[in-house]
Amino acid sequence: MNTPRIIVAMSGGVDSSVAAWRLNSQREAIAGLFMRNWTDDGNGQCHAEEDRRDAVAVCGILGIAFHFRDFSHEYWQEVFTHFLAEYANGRTPNPDVLCNREIKFKHFLETARELGADRIATGHYARIEHYRQRWHLLRGADRSKDQSYFLHQLGQEQLAATLFPIGDLEKQQLRQLAHQTGLPTHAKKDSTGICFIGERNFREFLKQYLPAQPGEIRDPQEQRIAEHPGVFYFTLGQRQGLNIGGVRNRPPSPWYVIGKDLATNVLYVDQHRDSPFLQSRWLRSEPAHWVSGSPPAPTFTCTAQTRYRQADEPCKVTVRNDGSLDVDFTRTQWAVTPGQSLVLYDGNECLGGAVIATTDAPLERKRARNLSKTENVLQ
């Protein structure tokens, strides 16, 4: 058997199936590899075995070799432990970003090279182009499916060794191709959410690792509204799962999470989705990663997303001495959440991004002050 030049990450879904089919149709020397990133915990919520069988079937139809690698230990150590630590610290992490950086474009890429390949391919909706003497990460043609947000931590080395064969396709086109070519995954439902949680209640899953720490739910005026099981089970802007019944002298309107204070174990809520406590015009990030290797300038304008599938928001970015960013938005932003990813764009090009550290939302400023006081006491 000839040594494959490209190893395709086969997830068992329609996207990676069509990615492999397109490369195979171009007579590229390819093989497929299925990654197991989570060990089934007995709840039957992670469909890894079903996905593996589908990946095997597609590789068989295409006549390409199939490989399997278990990265569950690496995933636990490099993604999941960070995921838990962030929630324990009251932040809302994005494990997909870390999984791409540490697993798919690190361990998987290393494995592909061990198998003799010099490139990898995945079913991501994104594009890579080379011009002006460097590699550029671009949005996928289907803006509703674009995944460049989750790929912003990639650099020049990874892009040089990566192919995104379906980045120029719309999802509907892709499914039609899969159906026309007889791929068994053509009608398979898209995966959503995080595999290790599946269809389970998120809070119940998190309780297995972060035991409940009940505390008070208060409104912006510090009036007690109800009790919560743990502030780390909630995120800014959340409406569901608060279990707040009728409150005396309050209208029967829904409540929204507007802030959390770990130092006092208080969860703050308000009855207005457009509450001023959910609005911010400024954020500071942790040190940023740049796809090109460096920022465009010490200060520059671009657009940003602070959550996946958000519309582009114009902003001014200032790079601080430690590599972190100060970002001033042209318009007020809703529920900008520490722990989530800030991703920067110049048109369709993804420049890079960073983890959001703090904002100028009123309760976030209070949280930062209380946290600083707590740290000073501990010191």
From Swiss-Prot:
Provide this UniProt record's keywords sorted from A to Z: ATP-binding, Cytoplasm, Disulfide bond, Nucleotide-binding, RNA-binding, Transferase, tRNA processing, tRNA-binding
**Entries under InterPro entries matching the protein:** MnmA-like, MnmA-like_C, MnmA-like_central, MnmA-like_central_sf, Rossmann-like_a/b/a_fold
The UniProt annotation puts the region (Interaction with tRNA) at 145-147, 307-308
Which top-rank group of organisms is this from?
Bacteria
What Gene3D superfamilies does the entry give? Adenine nucleotide alpha hydrolases-like domains (2.30.30.280), HUPs (3.40.50.620), Translation factors (2.40.30.10)
Please tell me whether the keyword Amino-acid biosynthesis is annotated for this protein. Answer: no
> Which GO cellular component terms, listed alphabetically, does the Swiss-Prot or TrEMBL entry include?
cytoplasm
What family does the Swiss-Prot or TrEMBL record give for this protein?
A: Belongs to the MnmA/TRMU family.
Protein name, per record: tRNA-specific 2-thiouridylase MnmA
Q: Which organism is it from?
A: Xylella fastidiosa (strain Temecula1 / ATCC 700964)
